[in-house]
Amino acid sequence: MRVFLFLMLFFNSFVWAQQEGNKFLINNDYLVQFPESVKYIRTDENSGAFLFHDKQNSNIQVSVRPSQNMEFYKEGLSQTELLEAFYKWDFDFWKSNTINAKVTEISKKLSEGYVLWGIELDYESQKINQIILSGVKENNVVFISIINPKMKMNEKKKLLIDLYKKGISKHN
């Protein structure tokens, strides 16, 4: 079930009443600003991830959720401890899965508030390579990912990091 949700991550939700653009309000709380226009596809009710598609045929997922609603949450965790718990929870799930996904850590930048990692799996005769950024902002866990087989790894990493650092902010 989680594999399906991971790959699809779609459902109806409020996204600023627009379907295309570079700014979207998610969860009525966070403004996500993309470097270029993207198309909002849908939102997944279970994961809270919003799915977008850009002109380079990238599938981009963004989720910002209250950490206290997560099963790994413990009262009193620092931002760094929260990030490590979130990353470990998601990473370990995929590492121990039954679908033969290959899970790798790309870079761990705890001082900058994020971890980059990847999941590679075969799905319906296609090799899927998803790069993920796990982060924490204002005690909320942030999940951003991209799937685009034509994009270079450095471009994917830059997009995720820039989106995390500059593109996601609390909406007043």
Residue ranges and their predicted role:
Residues 3-13, 17:
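Sec-dependent N-terminal signal peptides
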Residues 36-38, 66, 120-121, 146-148:
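A mature extracytoplasmic/lumenal domain signature
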Residues 46-134:
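Conserved polar/disulfide-associated segments of primarily extracytoplasmic proteins
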Residues 18, 38, 140-172:
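Surface-exposed amphipathic alpha-helical segments
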Residues 34, 79-82, 86, 90, ...:
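Stable alpha-helical elements in mature extracytoplasmic
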